[in-house]
Every structure is written in structure tokens, then in C-alpha cells.
């Protein structure tokens, strides 16, 4: 029987630009972008196996010296600038007199507040490339009325009311649910932003969650040393991981393969995703996944996800399978595999990988 399409999937097809699938994309800057009538630029949608109708993603291009068409929509959106510099003009529906303007550059990350009118402007003589993650699948599938989603005049003044300092970078960080959470609507350069120690996930690992635009769509920035790797864990689908620095690989495997997939003769179920700067991938619901740095510099990853524990506004559906949390061992009811419990083949393969490229490292040990 042919698979039926959701309202969101039908909309993607009607948009007239490529839709890229699979477990991951090695370099989003190399995708085949096509002219995009609705936005006035070029673009491609990315709909990976692990996104599962929770999150949407696309890559957009703004022509040199040009701008995209103004738009507003009833879904949340986070934008990361891959290349170029420019500005965003933003205002509430029906409030043209109070337009705000803020500038961005390569590495900038910001939220588009819910249902605000906005326009992205290229300030350079080269194309601007950006990656956007949205909650469009949830909203379009629930309402199945795209014109309403894209043309509502409702003003969410609790999210945005043209505050003069709305997009001024802040460094407000608080511990929320055991995580350091950064409350800001704009990060000038996510590639160099300060991240906080989080060694429960691995030796030398640093992770800082961020909360933008009053959204349930949030994320975190993770960094870990040369020659090291994260502990494996799982969570709900929909999380999207973008590599900002270094190179390496990620292993992903389904829950039925167990915590030691090689020992239990399930090696054929382990998916390996090689990554470098510009790679993006998404682990499916309940799949263990583990990140390995084989490069000669600290790895840095930008994650987009819903707020299950760390953010101000939580999405219950996203934390449904997270049990006691991604930083708690499976032995204690969580979803994380401690180094001593992992499949020995995993460390052996990693040590062989870093030895082949001459990268010093100590794998998961101190």
C-alpha cells in the first residue's frame, strides 16, 4: 500500500523546490537549490527520517544585494546564517509603523517570533546561505489549512511587541532542569559562543541550552575535545544536529539492537553518519546515537529540538520517551549508556579511527 502523505508533506511538494531525505546531509551548502517563488530566493527542504513530522527544515539563499519576500506564519522558526551577512526587518501584523531592524553575519543564530512579519535582506555582493528549523509540520498537520497558517493577523504580543532591546545579545544563563539555559533572542556567532561544562555526557563535554523568542522550539550548543566522544543516549525524534566545527562520525541504532548492538549480532542495524562542518542529521525516536570527534580541533555542534526539560515552555509530546532524562544512565531509568556499559567494539573502532588519521586522543577516558 502506498504511503499516504500528511498535510505538511503535500505542502512541501506544492512548494516546487527539492525535498532531501535520508538520515543526514553531508554538506548543506552543496544541496541542489531551486528558484522558490514564494520567498523570492532559492531553496531546498530537508526532511530526514528522524524528524518524524515534529520539525521542518530548509536551506535558503538570498541573492547578492537582494531580499526575500516578507512573510509571517503560525509556526516557530530558528535561523542560522551559514554564509554572508545582512539584516532582518521585523514587525507585527498590521503594525507597519513599528518596524525593527537587526544585523547578522556568518554564524549568527536568531528566532523569528511567532507570526511576526519579517524580511531577510542580503547586505553583501555574494549570496547569503542560511538554514532554518521550524515547527511547521506540527502546525500544518494539525490545522491542515496552509492559507490560515500563512496569513493570520493575530499579534502574539506576549512573544514580541517591538521591544527596542529584543534582539540585543544577552548572557542571561540559569540552571533549569539540570541544564544551563541561555535566555537570548540573538547569538552573534554560535561558532565561538561560550558553552558550559556538562561532563555527565562525557569527559570534556560542554553543553549550553538556549531559549529564544518564547518558543518551545529551542536547542543547545555542544562542544567536546579532540580524540573524545559522547556517551550514547536516545530521545524523541525531531532533534536536528548541525556540525559547526571539526569532523567525525555519529553512530545510530534502533532500540531493538540493545545497548551493545555489535555483541548482540545487530551490527547490520547500526547506521554510521560521517560529518564535517555543514553536515546535518537527525536521530529517529528511541534510537541510541553517539558522536565521535576524529578531527584535529574541538568539535562543535548546534542542536535544534523541542523543550522537554531545559526550556521555559515545555512540549510534553517531545519528552514522552525520555524517561528520567538524557543525562541519566539506562541503569537508573534514563536513556544514556555509560562508557563502562557500552559495546567494546564502539571504543575499539574509534581508537582505530583516530590512530589512522594521527589524531591524539583518549577516547572516553580521562
Language model region names:
Residues 2-7, 11-15, 239-241, 252-365:
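C-terminal functional regions that serve as terminal interaction/effector modules
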Residues 38-45, 56-73, 220-236, 251-256, ...:
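Conserved short histidine dyad/triad with adjacent acidic residue
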Residues 67, 72, 76-106, 116, ...:
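A short beta-strand-loop-beta hairpin characteristic of the jelly-roll/cupin
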Residues 46-49, 67-73, 101-102, 121-122, ...:
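Short histidine-centered beta-strand/loop micro-motifs
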Residues 138-144, 309-314:
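A short beta-to-alpha transition loop/helix N-cap that caps and shapes the active-site region
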Residues 1-53, 145-220, 336-366:
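A short, N-terminal "cap"/entry segment at the start of jelly-roll beta-barrel domains
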Residues 63-64, 102-125, 130-136, 272-295, ...:
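Conserved metal-binding segment of the jelly-roll/cupin
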Residues 85-87, 127, 247-249, 288, ...:
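Structural motif
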Amino acid at each position: 500500500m502506498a504511503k499516504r502523505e500528511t498535510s505538511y508533506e503535500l505542502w512541501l511538494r506544492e512548494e516546487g523546490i527539492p525535498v532531501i531525505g535520508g538520515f543526514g546531509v553531508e554538506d548543506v551548502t552543496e544541496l541542489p537549490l531551486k528558484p522558490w517563488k514564494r520567498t523570492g530566493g532559492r531553496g531546498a527542504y530537508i526532511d530526514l527520517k528522524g524528524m518524524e513530522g515534529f520539525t521542518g527544515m530548509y536551506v535558503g539563499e538570498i541573492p547578492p544585494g537582494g531580499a526575500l519576500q516578507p512573510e509571517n506564519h503560525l509556526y516557530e522558526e530558528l535561523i542560522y546564517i551559514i554564509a554572508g551577512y545582512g539584516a532582518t526587518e521585523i514587525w507585527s501584523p498590521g503594525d507597519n509603523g513599528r518596524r525593527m531592524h537587526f544585523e547578522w553575519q556568518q554564524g549568527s543564530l536568531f528566532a523569528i517570533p511567532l507570526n511576526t512579519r519579517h524580511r531577510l535582506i542580503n547586505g553583501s555582493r555574494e549570496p547569503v546561505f542560511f538554514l532554518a528549523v521550524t515547527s511547521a509540520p506540527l502546525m500544518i498537520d494539525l490545522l491542515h489549512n496552509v492559507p490560515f497558517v500563512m496569513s493570520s493577523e493575530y499579534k502574539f504580543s506576549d512573544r514580541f511587541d517591538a521591544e527596542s532591546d529584543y534582539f540585543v545579545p544577552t548572557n542571561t544563563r540559569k540552571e533549569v532542569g539540570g541544564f544551563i539555559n541561555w535566555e537570548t533572542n540573538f547569538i552573534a556567532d554560535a561558532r565561538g559562543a561560550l558553552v558550559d561544562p556538562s561532563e555527565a555526557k562525557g569527559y570534556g563535554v560542554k553543553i549550553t541550552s538556549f531559549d529564544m523568542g518564547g518558543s518551545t522550539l529551542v536547542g543547545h550548543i555542544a562542544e567536546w575535545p579532540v580524540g573524545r566522544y559522547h556517551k550514547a543516549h536516545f530521545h524523541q525524534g525531531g532533534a536536528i544536529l548541525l556540525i559547526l566545527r571539526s569532523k567525525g562520525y555519529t553512530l545510530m541504532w534502533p532500540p531493538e539492537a540493545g545497548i551493545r548492538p555489535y555483541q548482540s549480532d545487530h551490527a547490520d542495524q547500526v547506521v554510521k553518519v560521517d560529518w564535517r562542518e555543514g553536515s546535518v542529521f537527525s536521530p529517529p525516536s528511541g534510537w541510541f546515537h553517539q558522536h565521535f570527534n576524529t578531527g584535529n580541533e574541538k568539535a562543535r555542534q548546534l542542536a535544534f529540538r523541542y523543550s522537554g526539560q531545559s526550556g521555559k515552555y515545555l512540549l510534553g509530546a517531545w519528552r514522552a520517551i525520555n524517561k528520567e532524562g538524557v543525562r541519566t544512565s539506562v541503569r537508573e531509568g534514563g536513556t544514556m549508556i555509560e562508557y563502562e556499559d557500552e559495546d567494546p567494539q564502539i571504543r575499539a573502532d574509534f581508537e582505530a579511527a583516530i590512530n589512522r588519521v594521527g589524531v591524539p586522543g583518549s577516547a572516553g577516558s580521562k
